[in-house]
Amino acid sequence: MYDTDPHRRGSRPGPYHGKERRRSRSSAAGGTLGVVRRASRKSLPPHARKQELCLHERQRYRGLFAALAQTPSEEIAIVRSLSVPLVKTTPVSLPFCLDQTVADNCLTLSGMGYYLGIGGCCPACNAGDGRFAATSREALILAFVQQINTIFEHRAFLASLVVLADRHNAPLQDLLAGILGQPELFFVHTILRGGGACDPRLLFYPDPTYGGHMLYVIFPGTSAHLHYRLIDRMLTACPGYRFVAHVWQSTFVLVVRRNAEKPTDAEIPTVSAADIYCKMRDISFDGGLMLEYQRLYATFDEFPPP
């Protein structure tokens, strides 16, 4: 008869029996823990999973960036080798002065936020690159002088003056002469027309600080995007003016006004307001456009200009 009781004295388990038992226990526990971890990770909401992944990536590269920070020369070499910017957008607050932008900056305004972008990495800027006309300062001056020959193209600009004259019972020709005395306002209108902008409306208000008139560029819809080339051309064409983006009653507006009491540049020829006024009488302004301007003026009468 053989003794089969393993607990009796003198009987010992094999040399690998305990190890196999411990291994089986640990594998079972590890397998269960892995399942629990995977299950708990899947049960997290999407934003929490994304945050967890970002934290993991940050921890992964923390040592690399800490080492680079100790050697500035290598840090600069790494940054110069990057072909894609590390930061593509920067949030801003309104009112925002476009003088704070740098070359290649675009501006996006929407209900989701306001931020500066990099034109080379902006899909909206890349999509609109082909729609820009030649709007150098020389070309703008030429368009200003020859506007009487293309007056119908500027009906949105002139219709606003007609509505403004009616609201204040002012002579239209005198108002037109005052606006033409600030060619930069016409430059902004021409740049917007040639820059693929989404047909903005133009309002004129007296400037209580520096005299003359301010221009409110009203963007339709619930969002606006200013192409980086458009920003650069406006700032270049109007060196004595300030451009401030703002919002009023859910409508985005770009305020254009003088920086100081500065006379008009002597290199810009004068344009006869009487000739433009006579030519305007041949234009039949759309009734819907005139009603829209009346509504916009009523909306922005209480707007405090920045």
Swiss-Prot record:
Keywords: Host membrane, Host nucleus, Membrane, Metal-binding, Phosphoprotein, Zinc, Zinc-finger. GO terms for cellular component: host cell nuclear inner membrane; membrane. The keyword Magnesium does not apply. It comes from the Viruses. Residues 1-49 are annotated as: Disordered. It is found in: Host nucleus inner membrane. InterPro entries: Herpes_UL31. Its main location: host cell. One of its GO terms (biological process) is viral budding from nuclear membrane. Phosphorylated at serine residues in the N-terminus. This phosphorylation regulates the localization within the inner nuclear membrane. The keyword Acetylation does not apply. GO terms for molecular function: zinc ion binding. A zinc finger (CCCH-type) spans 106-225. Signal peptide: none annotated. Plays an essential role in virion nuclear egress, the first step of virion release from infected cell. Within the host nucleus, NEC1 interacts with the newly formed capsid through the vertexes and directs it to the inner nuclear membrane by associating with NEC2. Induces the budding of the capsid at the inner nuclear membrane as well as its envelopment into the perinuclear space. Belongs to the herpesviridae NEC1 protein family. Forms a heterohexameric complex with NEC2. Interacts with capsid vertex specific component 2/CVC2; this interaction directs the capsid to the host inner nuclear membrane to initiate budding. This is Nuclear egress protein 1. It comes from Human herpesvirus 1 (strain 17) (HHV-1). The lineage of its organism: Viruses, Duplodnaviria, Heunggongvirae, Peploviricota, Herviviricetes.
